[in-house]
C-alpha cells in the first residue's frame, strides 16, 4: 500500500510549528514494569506529550471543537452499543455534563496538539513512513484481519487519507522516541 507524501497529507492539516526541534527530554521513572514493547509504547506516548507542549502558531479553535465533538460522538456510539445512553453512563459515574464537556475539551486539545506536533516534527526531519510502518498500523487496528481492513480502506478515500496521516504521525513518533533523551 502506498502512502501519500507529507506535502499531500499536510494539505488538510494546519501547519503548526514547534518552538524547538531539539530532542525531547523524558523520564521513564513512572513507566509501568512491562515488556519491552509496552515500555516502547509508553516512551512514545510520553515523548509525544512532551513535544505537544512546544506547539506554537495560530490554530483555529474550530479544530479543537471538531476533535471534542468526535470524542463525544464516539462515546455516545459506545454507550448505545452497550444498550445505554451517554447521559446514563455519566450519571452512573457521577460526572456532570459540564465536567464531561471540559474533560473532552482537554482531551481533544491534547490530541490535536500531539498530532500537530508530530506533523511539524515529520516536516522538519523529512520523515516518511515505511511500508513496515503502514503494516504495523494496520495490524494494530485490526489484528488478524489486516487484509479485510486494507480492502475496506481502499474503497474510502477519506479513511485512506486518515490512515496516511496516522501512519506518518506514527513514523514521526517513532523517530521522536528514538531521539529522546531519557533522564
Give the predicted meaning of each segment.
Residues 1-183:
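FKBP-type peptidyl-prolyl cis-trans isomerases
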Amino acid at each position: 500500500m502506498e502512502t501519500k507524501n507529507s506535502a499531500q497529507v499536510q494539505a488538510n492539516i494546519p501547519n503548526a510549528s514547534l518552538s524547538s526541534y531539539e530532542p525531547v527530554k523524558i523520564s521513564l521513572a513512572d513507566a509501568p514494569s512491562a515488556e519491552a514493547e509496552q515500555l516502547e509504547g509508553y516512551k512514545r506516548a510520553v515523548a509525544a506529550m512532551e513535544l505537544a507542549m512546544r506547539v506554537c502558531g495560530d490554530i483555529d479553535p474550530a479544530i479543537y471543537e471538531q476533535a471534542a465533538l468526535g470524542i463525544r460522538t464516539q462515546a455516545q456510539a459506545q454507550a448505545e452499543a452497550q444498550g445505554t445512553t451517554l447521559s446514563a453512563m455519566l450519571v452512573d459515574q457521577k460526572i456532570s455534563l459540564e465536567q464531561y464537556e471540559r474533560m473532552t475539551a482537554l482531551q481533544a486539545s491534547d490530541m490535536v496538539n500531539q498530532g500537530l506536533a508530530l506533523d511539524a516534527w515529520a516536516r522538519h526531519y523529512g520523515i516518511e513512513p515505511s511500508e513496515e510502518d503502514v503494516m504495523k498500523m494496520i495490524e494494530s487496528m485490526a489484528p488478524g484481519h489486516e487484509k479485510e481492513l486494507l480492502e475496506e480502506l481502499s474503497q474510502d478515500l477519506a479513511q485512506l487519507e486518515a490512515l496516511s496521516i496516522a501512519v506518518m504521525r506514527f513514523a514521526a513518533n517513532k523517530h521522536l522516541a528514538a531521539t529522546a533523551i531519557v533522564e
